[in-house]
Amino acid sequence: AGAIGFSTGLFYPPSQAAPTEEVIELGKALHDHAGLHTTHMRDEANHITDSLEETFRIGREADIPVVISHHKCSGADNHGRSAETLPLIDAAMKKQRVGLDVYPYIASSTMLNPQRMMGASRVLVTWSVPHPEHAGRDLDDIAKEMGLPPLEAAEKLLPAGAVYFSMAEEDVQRIMQYPHSMIGSDGLPHDTRPHPRLWGTFPRVLGHYSREVGLFPLEEAVRKMTGLSAIQFGLKDRGTLKVGHYADIVMFDPATVIDTASFADPMQPATGIELVIVNGRPVWRDGAVTGTRPGRAIRRQQLGTFGKAV
């Protein structure tokens, strides 16, 4: 069908019921088709090293590339553990094909699950089917209004989505600074009041972490969100400015580019982005979308090879 590979969310039902061996067998079907496996690992908290080993094992035994989605160390008990996880990833990269991405925030976003709130210092509701009026509000405030403990209030809101403040800034910066990490948003566009990463991820890296914090040079920030991603996913003739390559171009002012989306007001466009071109046609110009839709699906037969320059 032209698929690049397959992804798993072993943290979530029903995928969490799948044993490692089942994922390995699925992965073996990708081997002869140059496919890859991306994963939201089974545990990004207390058992994160076990989950890393599971991910590496899937890649080794299926003989396929694996990409760790939005690598993080979640929960207060795990703050600082990126100093432990990154050397493990580095060692695995010397033996097999491993990639990873990261988003530039200390908060994650997914379904609201009362049983998985304990490691978060703050929970922000992004949507709720029975109580849509609470989208964008802190769970603690909602619970006080309801006269209920937060866990019981969360039950009343289900099904719902939430932002969880559960990471440490030191880990976010360390993972972003790691030479092999790609930048990705992990954005969820359907949420009523989404995580600001949907609008702010890439300008936040360029403006805040590169220019203001000095985490890495601008050129490295750009590489992490363009050329490195193209190499890791085998996107042939994309990711670099080169004669003959597809013209996917963002023109921005390095002195002013910055995210303006916040958790309080998450759907705000960045400043300093002058022009966005996709496949040679402008899609954003003069502060507004042009209405042109030149994007297209990239099928497997058009791809390059994971881990090699294209």
Indicate residue ranges for each PLM-predicted region.
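Generic beta-strand/beta-sheet core signal
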Residues: G9, T38-R42, S69-H71, D101-Y103, ...
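C-terminal cap of metal-dependent C-N hydrolases
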Residues: R174-H180, S185-D186, T201, V250-I298
